Structure formats: C-alpha cells, structure tokens
Amino acid sequence: MLPSSRYIRCAGYEIHCTEWGAPEAPVVIAWHGLARTGRDMDALARHLSSRYRVICPDTIGRGLSQWARTPRDEYRLSFYARIAADLFAQLGIDMAHWIGTSMGGAIGTVCASGLFEPQLKGRIMRLLLNDNAPRLADAALERIKAYAGQPPAFDTVMELEAFFRQVYQPYGWLSDAQWRQLTETSTRRLPDGRVTPHYDPAMVQQFTHHENDYLIWDHYDRLHIPVLCLRGAQSDLVLPETTAEMLTRGPGTRGLLQVVEVPGCGHAPALNVPEQFALVDGFLSDT
C-alpha cells in the first residue's frame, strides 16, 4: 500500500503528513525525531496500515512542512502540541494511539497530559515512547545539538548518505534500500547546488531559548493511559536510571508502564524490523 500525501493548515502553517490505511480504521499518530521527517515511519506505517489509519506528520521546520517565522517562539514543545491539536481537528480525529520517536515521544507526552492543549486530554489512548523519557541525558543532548545545529552540506547525495549511515548507526539494522530511502526523504538542495539534511537548522534554538523543554515530569506524572517505553539498549539519551524512575512515578505507579530494552540499537530504534513490529503490535492490541 502506498500512502497519500496531505498538506494541512495547523497553527497558521502548512504541515505535511503522509497517511496510510483506511480512513475508517482506528488512528495511530506516528511522530518522528528531532532532525528527521515523517517518512522515517514508512516501514512501521506500512506494516500497521492493514489495521490502522496511520498519520505521519512532518514537524514544522522539517521535511515538507513550512519553516517557523519566529524560531525562538515556535520551535518548542508547546507549539508542537498546538500543531498536533489542529491536526486532530483538521483530520477529524477523535481518539488515537500515539507512537513517538525521541522528540515525537515528548510531543505525545505533552499532548496526552492536556497541560498545553486541554482539548487533547483523554483523546490519546496509548502512548509508545521510542527512546524517549521525561528526562534526557545532558551529554547526549549536547551531541545531538552539535550535529543538528550545524548540518553539513555535500556535493553529492551519496556523500550525504554516507554521513547519514554514520550519524544514525545507532538506529540498528537498515537494509541498503532503507538507507537509500532515508537519504532521499531527508535531503534538500541548497542554492549553491550542494545537498543537506531536510530541516531548518534554526530548530535547535529550542535548546537555547527553552533549555528545559524536554524535562517533562509534570506532564508524565499526569498520564493515566498505558505507556510503553522502548529503550535502545545502547542509548545514551535515555539512561537506565531514568526508566527506573519512570516506574516509580505517574503511570509507573498505576501499573500502566512497560519498559522494554531493544537490543542492537542506541538512539533510537528504527522500528523497521519484525521483532520491533511485534513489540508495537502487542502494545497496540493489548486490552
């Protein structure tokens, strides 16, 4: 099955998303990581599309979505939640499951808490955090800021693919075809003819102007829905002590949290192989 491509007006911006599956099926929102695009979710969305309507947005400033006019104010979780609320409204979504990689998991957490957008409270049924947690390791955040804030430019797409293979090695196993797709859906050409990753470098202002944006225990503690945290076994962003604390707070104290380590991955599992599909399937279908 091939996805449809949608352009939707959310919070004053044109937001692109790919949509898989039947319109009447239960909805899954699959939201990508910080410097990525919704097309990262293609393999998982294709797998889920026989049973779910899967929506994979490009965050503002990424992929085919518009870039922020005021980066300081709009590259932040509260604005991303506003976009998500408009996405629900524009697409006629009442209830949804949420799968979020890294930043996408944080957006799902703040949406599910209802603190930023009260109209979303109670409308996210299950939350899957793919290598995301309410506190992230400082050293890993510095690493991510370093490569995301100064994206390189190359003469050829093949050079950019080699860069992606290096920087995203912690994703785990990808086939050559998947690396090629990751590259081709993550590339834009600069005015000088070189190619660079497909996002607005100004999005890292989130860390400068909102340095505690990803410290979201107050949102996590308010969750009363099932949560699955997939931690890459070699992740430097989500530490074991953080997942241990998650079990003592919020949904962890209510018997609603599962933590599973994904072998062979760091930050973050690509959600592209049968073993990872099985984890997602089991969580979404668990009643």
Please state what every model-predicted region is.
Residues 13, 43, 56-99, 118-120:
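Active-site loop/oxyanion-hole signature of alpha/beta-hydrolase fold enzymes
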Residues 13-67:
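Conserved HGGG/HGGXW glycine-rich cap/lid loop of the alpha/beta-hydrolase fold
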Residues 94-138:
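Conserved hydrolase catalytic core segment
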Residues 224-265:
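Conserved loop-alpha-helix segment in the C-terminal half of the alpha/beta-hydrolase fold
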